[in-house]
Amino acid sequence: MNTSDLKQEFTEAFDTKPERVFFSPGRINLIGEHTDYNGGHVFPCAITIGTYGVYAPRTDTTVRMYSANIPDAGIVTFDVNDLSYDKAAGWTNYPKGMMDEIAKTGVKFDHGFDFYVHGNMPDGAGLSSSASIELLTGIMLNTGFNLGISQLDLVKIGQKCENNYVGVNSGIMDQFAVGMGKKDQAILLDTNTMDYSYAPVKLGNNVIVIMNTNKRRELADSKYNERRSECEEALRRLQTKLDIKSLGDLTNDQFDEAAYLINDETLIKRARHAVFENQRAIRATKALADDDLTTFGELVTASHVSLHFDYEVTGKELDTLAETAWKQPGVLGARMTGAGFGGCGIAIVDKDQVDAFKENVGKVYRDTIGYDADFYIAEIADGPKEL
């Protein structure tokens, strides 16, 4: 999307002149899934598909928002002095929640604005459209109101918006991946300490293919909160004998020795995924740094197997994509990415095999599921910026 088209769309929506244009990426997670709320490591990166926003200040205290992706919602209007949650406000609760969380830090919004949003992420694909719009709003407010909030603080405000305002008990990964993204680099983040480092994603002759199930998933309505509470209960039982703060504190061997304390087969499976996936994320980062792409791919695949058997968040659509991908020539590894229950998977595929990969996996998916999957090459992007 180019800025002149976006500005034209803004003018058509609001019948006024736009002032600034911003972009905020989506994200994929290479490995380390459902570990961010268990004190583990994640290894995500921002991607070049995401959300564009066009902004113009107003002289009154009215805020008007319009999304090209949800035209039926029309122009949603509220006042800067009333930032209370309103279910009927739909998608605008994400930017409104960011305003509310920023206002709690003592910021006073002294004027309103018009905000036009246009995303090019597939709908419901699990590429973090909510974190993308939160951090888009963050950079827009930070710039438009000259707030001087650090990018890391905007990331934390984004998570608060999701948890406290929207009501989804998510970890920090999505906002961190979107907000702190760097071109061609993934981020190894320790969610226990918030220590992070950047790692170049050097895949040789391979590319990351995003595989979209085209099965919608709503994070708030999924079993996400259930899995989180299962892990919290498993941790509580382990803490009766172990001095640990999170499941991410344990090695695989330590977990195996102590698993009897959990005394519930389902809870053991959930916790085992969190512990083993954390170790996989650490090992995968090292493998990538060592140019050991075979090991990296094997760990990516092992992640999906664990998410299927132990965490049970994959479902037929994601399993069909991953399991079919594993059988294709030139594939190093494949897995679901994101919360699961639909959304997207990723595969590490030899560039020269991508066309055959899309055709073969696409055919099996269509024959098995009854509708098409979509495939895109992921390009790793910078975090939010003004265009």
Curated annotation (Swiss-Prot):
Q: Which GO terms describe its biological process?
A: galactose metabolic process
**Residue sites binding substrate per the record:** E33, H34, T35, D36, Y224
Which species is the source of this protein?
Answer: Lactiplantibacillus plantarum (strain ATCC BAA-793 / NCIMB 8826 / WCFS1)
- Provide the binding site for ATP: S67, G124, A125, G126, L127, S128, S129, S130
Under which EC number(s) is this enzyme classified?
A: 2.7.1.6
Question: Top-down, what is the taxonomic lineage of the species of origin?
Answer: Bacteria, Bacillati, Bacillota, Bacilli, Lactobacillales
**Location(s) in or outside the cell:** Cytoplasm
Q: Which residues catalyse the reaction?
A: D174
Protein name as catalogued: Galactokinase
Gene label: galK
